[in-house]
Amino acid sequence: MKTVRFNKQALAILAACFIFLLCVVCYFSASSESHNAVVVGERARGHIAVRDVENRHLAEEKHAVIHAKTVGKIERVVSQEKVEILRPARVESKPPGEKTSTEPEETGVGKAPIQTSEGLEKLIGKIHYENKDEENDLRRQKVKEMMIHAWEGYKNYSWGANELRPMSKKPNSQNIFGGSQMPATIVDAADTLFIMDLKDKYKEARDYIENNFSMAKSTSTLSVFETTIRFLGGLLSLYALTQESFYIEKAREVGEALLPAFNTPSGIPKSNLDVASKHASNYGWANGGQSILSEIGSLHLEFLYLSRISNAPIFEKKVKKVRDALEKAEKPNGLYSNYINPDTGKFTGSHMSLGALGDSFYEYLIKSYVQSNYTDTQAKNMYWDVSDAIQKHMIKVSKQSNLTYTVELNNGQAQHKMGHLACFVPGMFALQAINEDTEEEKLRIMTLAEELAKTCHESYIRSETHIGPEMFYFNERDEATSKHSENGYIQRPEVIEGWFYLWRLTGKTMYRDWVWDAVQAIEKYCRVDSGFTGLQNVYNPKAGREDVMQSFFLAEFLKYAYLTFADESLISLDKWVFNTEAHPVPVLTN
């Protein structure tokens, strides 16, 4: 019996020991799992800095790879030891609503409609950065401060009107907008506010558009082109950025209001439209009442995207008919005249220009090819054909400084002048360069783009203000200057736009520096208490100001400047296409 009692006690002791050891094991096991979870969390936050390109499929971490867009940058990133550099996920960082000491405002703001900072950055790219670049951070914040200044001036003195007269502190109305209460600045600037993460100010714009914007407020004749690129383009971009469905409704309202302008025998729209009466007309000065190439050729991005998001094929059909007519029309030397008859679909006159009257048509050909995810072969073929003709007939080199520039043609005769508007061409050729098939052509076209960008830069630095004129000439007394006529500045963005593309597509910091110089010049010579003005004469700042703050100053100039100093993933050129008013719409992937 004693033996039995002893065995029972021993078993009890052993059982107790076993339970104790089991608890100890569980405790340390839990601690180990917790530690492992921390380690995994550290990996997820990006502490692994590199990854073998050949074994990338084995990695589970969802880091953002630094994506270089030019051939040279891609080679530099991938070719060294077959390693990609990884950018850590932004897990520990502050949410977009919080500001560092260098960021102007915003306080007490609500969430953007995109719901979360993670969702926002997934959609449009990095808003905040873990790899700090102090110089360009400060530049970017300065541009943001300029945007705030411009917006506050408009809000205080012209809210709900087209634009602001910043010196007079009164609303400005142009007849292109269809009446004084079409809020061009609000719709044009809203996506810039969103991209800059200015939540309070974006919400002001958003709420106004949702509750007040209506084409029924168009009480006079409007420009079909300007309404498309500013209002329709702005609304489409806002939908693409935020995914808020009311923007589709507003955009469709604009698109439907514009349809009567297309009711011509050829399908080519007229320039002007009275929305109430549905009466369309052309300008009398346009070669006797013809339609204008830059206007009819710069509707495709917007109408195509509107059809896709609204499931309304009518809009795409309208611009496809325009494209077909342009492709069919006879073109001397492969070049497009600035004027076309909307009844016959035939070009009239022989004035060709990459500046006013022609410009954005060419831009939209290559951008339509990109927007289609490189499937729109009609746009591709039309663009490459006319690009060859432009290079043959409309590109010249100056005798004095060997500056490459574009000319206008009139009856086959070259006019040796280049407009500020034509300085979008470097960006256009840069897009062409990265889509060329051979390395030789990539280099040749990119070199052309850079030479043209240099000429546009010369037009800026040869003025006293370091701001370029409306038009600059190449002759015995002028070279990239315009000291005798057309020497004002009305806040045009094309020069900045071209440098933005070249920064993104070549990675050369020189273009960032050029943009920054222009930003500083605008700040110095154009800023007033309630916004920004133009200049009467860029060679003589004492000559006076242009008392208008254009809606495109907020939509284009400040947006392109901001993006030049931002992370390259923010509105990536791989995923987005800018319309000619700098409103981004997505590349269509299905």
UniProtKB/Swiss-Prot annotation:
Question: Which GO molecular function terms does the record list?
Answer: calcium ion binding; mannosyl-oligosaccharide 1,2-alpha-mannosidase activity
Q: Where is the composition biased (Basic and acidic residues)?
A: 88-102
Q: Which residues lie on this side of the membrane: Cytoplasmic?
A: 1-9
Task: Cite the residue spans of the region called Disordered.
Answer: 88-112
Which GO BP terms apply?
A: carbohydrate metabolic process; ERAD pathway; protein glycosylation
Q: What is its EC number?
A: 3.2.1.113
Indicate which residues are glycosylated according to the record. N156, N212, N373, N402
Where it sits in the cell: the answer is:
Membrane
Q: Give me the residues that bind Ca(2+), please.
A: T580
**Active-site positions, per UniProt?**
E470
Q: Does the keyword Transmembrane helix apply?
A: yes
State the membrane topology.
Single-pass type II membrane protein
Chief subcellular location equals: membrane
SUPFAM superfamilies recorded:
Seven-hairpin glycosidases (SSF48225)
Q: Which reaction does it catalyse?
A: N(4)-(alpha-D-Man-(1->2)-alpha-D-Man-(1->2)-alpha-D-Man-(1->3)-[alpha-D-Man-(1->2)-alpha-D-Man-(1->3)-[alpha-D-Man-(1->2)-alpha-D-Man-(1->6)]-alpha-D-Man-(1->6)]-beta-D-Man-(1->4)-beta-D-GlcNAc-(1->4)-beta-D-GlcNAc)-L-asparaginyl-[protein] (N-glucan mannose isomer 9A1,2,3B1,2,3) + 4 H2O = N(4)-(alpha-D-Man-(1->3)-[alpha-D-Man-(1->3)-[alpha-D-Man-(1->6)]-alpha-D-Man-(1->6)]-beta-D-Man-(1->4)-beta-D-GlcNAc-(1->4)-beta-D-GlcNAc)-L-asparaginyl-[protein] (N-glucan mannose isomer 5A1,2) + 4 beta-D-mannose; N(4)-(alpha-D-Man-(1->2)-alpha-D-Man-(1->2)-alpha-D-Man-(1->3)-[alpha-D-Man-(1->3)-[alpha-D-Man-(1->2)-alpha-D-Man-(1->6)]-alpha-D-Man-(1->6)]-beta-D-Man-(1->4)-beta-D-GlcNAc-(1->4)-beta-D-GlcNAc)-L-asparaginyl-[protein] (N-glucan mannose isomer 8A1,2,3B1,3) + 3 H2O = N(4)-(alpha-D-Man-(1->3)-[alpha-D-Man-(1->3)-[alpha-D-Man-(1->6)]-alpha-D-Man-(1->6)]-beta-D-Man-(1->4)-beta-D-GlcNAc-(1->4)-beta-D-GlcNAc)-L-asparaginyl-[protein] (N-glucan mannose isomer 5A1,2) + 3 beta-D-mannose
Give the record's GO CC terms.
endoplasmic reticulum; Golgi membrane
Broad enzyme group: hydrolase
What metabolic or biological pathway is this protein involved in? Protein modification; protein glycosylation
Signal peptide (residue range)? none
Ordered alphabetically, the record's keywords are: Calcium, Disulfide bond, Glycoprotein, Glycosidase, Hydrolase, Membrane, Metal-binding, Signal-anchor, Transmembrane, Transmembrane helix
Q: Which family does it belong to?
A: Belongs to the glycosyl hydrolase 47 family.
Q: What is this protein called?
A: Mannosyl-oligosaccharide 1,2-alpha-mannosidase mans-2
Name the encoding gene, please. Answer: mans-2
